[in-house]
Every structure is written in structure tokens, then in C-alpha cells.
Amino acid sequence: MIVNIIDLLTGVEYTVNILHICYFHKRVNEFGKTAYIITLSNNKEIVVTHKQWSKIKNKVTMYNV
């Protein structure tokens, strides 16, 4: 399954196969804003907002057991 993800830091939109998402973790900045850092199979890290992550998290956990 393919999803479009916009990197919060660079503003670049990536088209990502969710099977390539290897790892993700939550970060909260000093202002209390939540972001998720997604690590792909090629070690590329993409920072996404909580809103973006909530749209794809069920798909990721369903396919990446």
C-alpha cells in the first residue's frame, strides 16, 4: 500500500510503500507539539505531524506485523 507523507522539516512530499516503514517513534517538542519520526528501510527519516501519522498508523500496524 502506497501513502503520501509530507516531511514536517523540509516540506517535501514522499510517496512511501508502508512495507518500507521499519520503525517509528513519538517526539514531543518544548511547546508540547507531538511529531512522529518514521524510519524507512533505506534509513531515511521523515518527521510527520500527529494528524498525518494518525491517518496511516492503522495501515502500518496492519501490514508490518
Where are each of the predicted segments found?
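Eukaryotic intrinsically disordered, low-complexity regulatory linkers and tails enriched in Ser/Thr/Pro
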Residues: 1-65
